[in-house]
Amino acid sequence: MLLSFAACSQNAKPAAKPDQPAQTETADSKNAQAETAETENVQIPNPWTDYDSKDDAVQAAGFDLTVPDKISGCSEKSYRVLSADGDVMFEIIYASGEDETARIRKAPGADDVSGDYNEYAETETVDAGGVSVTMKGENGLVKLAIWTNGDYSYALSVENAIGQSDMAALVSNIQ
């Protein structure tokens, strides 16, 4: 048995060892790394502005939001307005200390303004004071109501689910 080996001689770089990456860098790859490091620290500004009073929030939003005095026994409210890219949304949050009880939103248009993207086991459309309201929840209780009335969209979400008639009563007091 006769074996023959042939090889060509060239000035080639030695291959990287399998457990070590090749150490070749170009100016473009260094620039890309620098840009990535810079953009990792960039943050989008918060589009929400908090207001000390409802009157200040109404002035900023350009429209009023009528709400119940209390929801689930909670009357402490905070007022916020989102203003971004020509869109405006007025939000009132009911909270007891750090614990949020409910959130009401109103914005011009007919889109869902709830910001709630959860999947609910039950969705039903009901009449609440002459307005068609979509209610979402589970086990016969509701956590989210969304509706339109006139030129505005509304959303009411509650932390602790409530009965459909209780949600309808709250919705009928929101304008």
Please tell me what each predicted stretch does:
Residues 4-7:
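C-terminal motif of bacterial Sec signal peptides marking the signal peptidase cleavage site
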Residues 9-11:
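Bacterial signal peptide processing site
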Residues 13-45, 51:
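Low-complexity, Pro/Thr/Ser/Glu-rich flexible segments characteristic
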Residues 38-142, 149:
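Short, solvent-exposed recognition patches
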Residues 150-175:
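Surface-exposed amphipathic alpha-helical segments
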